[in-house]
Swiss-Prot record:
InterPro entries: AAA+_ATPase, FtsK/SpoIIIE/SftA, FtsK_4TM, FtsK_alpha, FtsK_dom, Ftsk_gamma, P-loop_NTPase, WH-like_DNA-bd_sf. ATP binds at G440, S441, G442, K443, S444, V445. Essential cell division protein that coordinates cell division and chromosome segregation. The N-terminus is involved in assembly of the cell-division machinery. The C-terminus functions as a DNA motor that moves dsDNA in an ATP-dependent manner towards the dif recombination site, which is located within the replication terminus region. Translocation stops specifically at Xer-dif sites, where FtsK interacts with the Xer recombinase, allowing activation of chromosome unlinking by recombination. FtsK orienting polar sequences (KOPS) guide the direction of DNA translocation. It comes from Xanthomonas axonopodis pv. citri (strain 306). This is DNA translocase FtsK. The chain crosses the membrane at residues 37-57, 92-112, 123-143, 179-199. Belongs to the FtsK/SpoIIIE/SftA family. The gene is ftsK.
Length: 785
């Protein structure tokens, strides 16, 4: 029983302790709930009081005035709101408008604000309430002293009047103002915790930052002013430009002629290859034009609207670089379109020429070529490639009237100019042609077009060719045609022999023309032909018949033109060297009157290939696309070829001018070349001239062709009978050097005689034959001392 009593008494004790814990746990919750309810109740009351104050009307009945009880109330708070607003305004003046805010702050502090700080200090809420009361008293007194001291309800109200009156009577106006101001500042500090020293420090920082801020604002204002002025200037310029655009004449757009190429009479005849007409066996007939492919229909270039738009774009792009210019004309062509630009006074051509790449980038085209001078016009040309490029066929050019009207058998069909008109040239007037460009620029196709132009214009009786093809690919296809002097040359040593023969033939023709009394090959052929037609042929003055052998005098015959094609001039220069350059220079200097002409082609336009000696004697040049302005200047002595488009696009420098013409070369397919070659092979047998490629060449009058191509007597000095042979032998055996130039220099004789002396020593076994590098070994021992 004793054990059961404590158990019974312990249960009530445990229940009491648990109830206390529950009450303690519920107490903060209840306090928070009551605070929230109190704030919810106070908030509408403060809003009601604030609305009553702001809608106060002096006509409403109140504490200080009586009115009509049945009159409408203007105050939003009704009659009670009008009474409360009148009481507050009369008591506190303008500070009454802040009273709801102060009451709200007091409610917040009392209910929520300082519950966390009560554990640290019990004076916090009390000091804040004291500060708010002090703020109310000091603010009303300050307003009454400083603003208005008239009616009771003005400024600080009754409270302000009492405070200001009591202070003024004791301390005077100055003392009252100072006291009220100090009380106001202290009250604000107590109510809010604001530190006036912190306020002054912050104000000082603001004042110090005011200087840089003003500088920035001043700078921004200056920039804004400048921007505004520039904007106004641009607007003014736009207005002026708009007026100019409205007044300016439209761009002159000259469309290409409808029939760009007029067919010749020969083209009308050669519409197809004759099937039943016999082919001439002597090769005198020209190949029909039907062997060539007909041109295909081409797409049009830029429309007039596009040309007008491009003209405006060019003007705007130049204006971006501060260049005033106006597009006055547009001339569309098969490959490019030329825009004529009239620059403003004071604008240099070099300023526009230096912007070619920038203009090309702005117009989104591959390249732009600037033409500095257009003959007969005061404008600058700007050549822009077309979007769709027209393919030019050789058959168009050979069927044109320009090609057919040319009476020269050396007429070359080069292509079309920028307007689409055929461009033909006379090789006899050039009289030599240099063709240069990078690989893939259309150089070999252009050479084939030139060859076919000559083959369609002249028979093998009027024209003979010597073709040198170091690459063994381009010109070898013409092997076996009756126009060739010798087989197509692929060995460069034979090429040197062929050039030596041409030099000797040039000298022989000069002697014939001198004997006949004419100045060029055309006059010589005319005189010989007239004599043959008259039945009194002229005898060869250089042929000396041998009566012992029964030889009769040989009559003269007309001489054909000779055209020498060298497809890759650089390879031949590398293999043969200076010797070939001298032969080519000699032909270029003198061969025009003799009817011998050169067409040199190279894909390496460098100064070691196109030397000054060659450029001085070959003024007519064709430049295809090159990689740099330096290469263009090497070929044409001016830039421009670096801006070409490739695929036959060329700059043609005619003889006697310094301004190149832009020409778009004609395309010739391999099938067309093979058809023409097969037709020429069937028209006549090949008739090579003997000895053209031989190492030792003898002319018809018995003279031997020397190393320089000049004829030398076969029985002249230079062998063992030469009086200088022994002296030359002594020099060679003593110096142990078998050099032609050394013998020539020591004996002070000509090159040909020194060469014959060395050859005589080789025949006598004194020196060895020349090795692959041209050196000889002295085999004989030195003379005894």
């Amino acid at each position: 029983m004793a054990k059961q009593v404590p158990e019974r008494s312990s249960k009530p004790a445990e229940g009491k302790s648990s109830s206390r814990k529950t009450a303690a746990a519920d107490n903060p919750r209840r306090q928070k709930l009551w605070r929230d309810l109190a704030l919810i109740a106070v908030a509408p009351l403060l809003l009601y009081l604030l609305a009553s104050l702001f809608t106060y009307s002096a006509t409403d009945p109140g504490w200080s005035r009586t009115g009509n009880l049945v009159a409408p109330i203007h105050n939003m708070g009704g009659r009670f709101g009008a009474l409360a607003a009148d009481v507050l305004l009369q008591l506190f003046g303008y500070v009454a408008f802040l009273l709801p805010v102060l009451l709200g702050a007091v409610a917040w502090i009392a209910l929520i604000g300082d519950r966390e700080e009560q554990t640290q200090s019990d004076l916090g809420p009390a000091l804040r309430l004291v500060g708010m009361v002090g703020f109310l008293i000091s603010s009303t007194g300050f307003l009454h002293l400083r603003l208005f001291q008239g009616e009771v309800a003005e400024a600080g109200g009754i409270l302000g009047k009492l405070v200001a009156g009591s202070l003024s009577s004791r301390f005077g106006a100055l003392g009252a103002n100072l006291f009220v101001l100090v009380l106001l500042l202290v009250s604000i500090t107590l109510a809010t915790g604001l530190s006036w020293f912190a306020v002054m420090e912050r104000i000082g920082k603001w004042v110090l930052a005011l200087g840089p801020l003003m500088q920035r604002k001043t700078h921004q204002a200056t920039e804004w002013q400048q921007t505004r002025v520039m904007r106004e200037e641009r607007e003014e310029v736009r207005k002026v430009d708009a007026v100019k655009q409205a007044k300016r004449e439209p761009v002159k757009i000259e469309p290409p002629p409808a029939p760009v190429v007029e067919k010749s009479e020969r083209a009308k005849r050669d519409t197809q290859i004759p099937m039943f007409q016999g082919v001439s066996t002597d090769g005198s007939d020209l190949p029909p034009l039907a062997l060539l492919d007909d041109p295909k229909p081409q797409t049009k270039g830029y429309s007039e609207e596009t040309l007008e738009t491009l003209s405006r774009q060019i003007e705007f792009k130049l204006k971006d670089f501060r260049i005033e210019a106006q597009v006055v004309g547009a001339y569309p062509g098969p490959v490019i379109t030329r825009f004529e630009i009239e620059p403003a006074p004071g604008i240099k051509v070099s300023q526009i020429s230096s912007l070619d790449k920038d203009i090309a980038r702005g117009l989104s085209v591959k390249s732009v070529r600037v033409v500095d001078v257009i003959p007969g016009k005061s404008v600058i040309g700007l050549e822009i490639p077309n979007v769709s490029r027209e393919m030019i066929f050789l058959s168009e050019l050979l069927r044109s009237k320009e090609y057919d009207k040319s009476a020269s058998p050396l007429t070359l069909a080069l292509g079309k100019d920028i307007a689409g008109r055929p461009t033909v040239a006379d090789l006899a007037r050039m009289p030599h042609l240099l063709v240069a460009g990078t690989t893939g620029s259309g150089k070999s196709v252009a050479v084939n077009a030139m060859v076919l132009s000559l083959l369609f214009k002249a028979s093998h009786k009027e024209l003979r060719m010597l073709m040198i093809d170091p690459k063994m690919l381009e010109l070898s296809v013409y092997q076996g045609i009756p126009h060739l002097l010798a087989p197509v040359v692929t060995d460069m040593k034979e090429a040197a022999n062929g050039l030596r023969w041409c030099v000797a033939e040039m000298e022989r023709r000069y002697k014939l023309m001198s004997a006949v009394g004419v100045r060029n090959l055309a006059g010589f052929n005319k005189k010989v032909k007239d004599a043959i037609d008259a039945g009194q042929p002229m005898m060869d003055p250089l042929f000396k018949p041998n009566p012992e052998l029964g030889e009769a005098p040989r009559p003269l015959e007309t001489l054909p033109f000779i055209v020498i094609f060298i497809d890759e001039f650089a390879d031949m220069m590398m293999i043969v060297g200076k010797k070939v350059e001298e032969l080519i220079a000699r032909l270029a200097q003198k061969a025009r009157a003799a009817g011998i002409h050169l067409i040199l082609a190279t894909q390496r336009p460098s100064v070691d290939v196109i030397t000054g000696l060659i450029k001085a004697n070959i003024p007519t040049r064709v430049a295809f696309q090159v990689s740099s302005k330096i290469d263009s200047r090497t070929i044409l002595d001016q830039s421009g070829a670096e801006a070409l488009l490739g695929n036959g696009d060329m700059l043609y420098l005619p003889p006697g001018t310094a301004l190149p013409d832009r020409v778009h070369g004609a395309f010739v397919s391999d099938e067309e070349v093979h058809r023409v070659v097969e037709h020429l092979k069937a028209s006549g047998p090949v008739s090579y001239v003997e000895g053209v490629l031989d190492e030792v060449q003898t002319m018809g009058d018995g003279t031997v062709v020397g190393a320089t191509g000049l004829p030398e007597s076969s029985g002249g000095g230079g062998d063992e009978s030469d009086p200088l042979y022994d002296e030359a032998l002594r020099i060679v055996t003593e110096t142990r050097r078998a050099s032609i130039s050394g013998v020539q220099r020591r004996l002070k004789i000509g090159y040909n005689r020194a060469a014959r002396l060395i050859e005589a020593m080789e025949a006598a076994g004194v020196v060895s034959p020349p090795e692959h590098n041209g050196d000889r070994t002295v085999l004989a021992p030195p003379p005894p001392k």
